[in-house]
């Protein structure tokens, strides 16, 4: 008998039929705007988002914080309309799309420069803002196309050089009126980079909208430290609201009160 045959006559080193599983396919989620403000540039109510099949960066889910952020923006269109808006860690990019539909002057939607994640954000922008029109493959045509768009997508690592972001703004206005940080607070090791990016890119009288849910109840203290530690970077926090929704996951009943929480804050310059 061959050394590489199993006792039942098969190949000892053959991979089982289910050894390699292809990554999950992208899936779709639809968000319906409750009350579209009359001043909204677009009265579109249904937003169909494509979400990546899986992501170590958690971009494959439509989080409660993102939905809350979208509702907040529709309820306060004056914070968005004709404003320069930046979203950090956009994932499915629901707040980005709401900002575009409301009539922001410019929206720069960013997330970690993972090819699948960024192309998925671009897909959602293309199909919800631009009627399915995709970006040109030709670099020169693509550049002109992006220059004419009010909503653009960029890969960006927090705290790095700002050129990929600022190139989309007018030369005489290199700051944002509104910066969106939706469900990013859980990245405790990245707080300093988020503070620096926010401080550097937020205009003097601008606001950062920070919304999060405590996905790890035992680390809530670390989450909330974000809103005190920001002072070391010249930023102050103001609580907008603490509310409760059905938590994203069915887990320990003892922690449901914490996991159902949604915190919303403004950050601004001290």
Curated annotation (Swiss-Prot):
Chief localization: cytoplasm
GO molecular function, one term: N-terminal protein N-methyltransferase activity
UniProt GO BP: methylation
Sequence intervals crossing the membrane: none
Keywords: Cytoplasm, Methyltransferase, S-adenosyl-L-methionine, Transferase
Cell location: Cytoplasm
Record has Transferase as a keyword: yes
EC class of the enzyme, as a word: transferase
Keyword Magnesium applies: no
UniProt region (Disordered), positions on chain: 1-45
Domain of life the protein comes from: Eukaryota
Record-listed S-adenosyl-L-methionine binding positions: 63, 89-91, 111, 158, 182
InterPro entries: EFM7, Methyltransf_16, SAM-dependent_MTases_sf
Pfam families, alphabetized: Methyltransf_16
GO cellular component terms listed in the entry, alphabetical order: cytoplasm
EC annotation from Swiss-Prot or TrEMBL: 2.1.1.-
CDD domains, per database record: AdoMet_MTases
UniProt record similarity statement: Belongs to the class I-like SAM-binding methyltransferase superfamily. EFM7 family.
Function: S-adenosyl-L-methionine-dependent protein methyltransferase that trimethylates the N-terminal glycine 'Gly-2' of elongation factor 1-alpha, before also catalyzing the mono- and dimethylation of 'Lys-3'.
Protein name as catalogued: Protein N-terminal and lysine N-methyltransferase EFM7
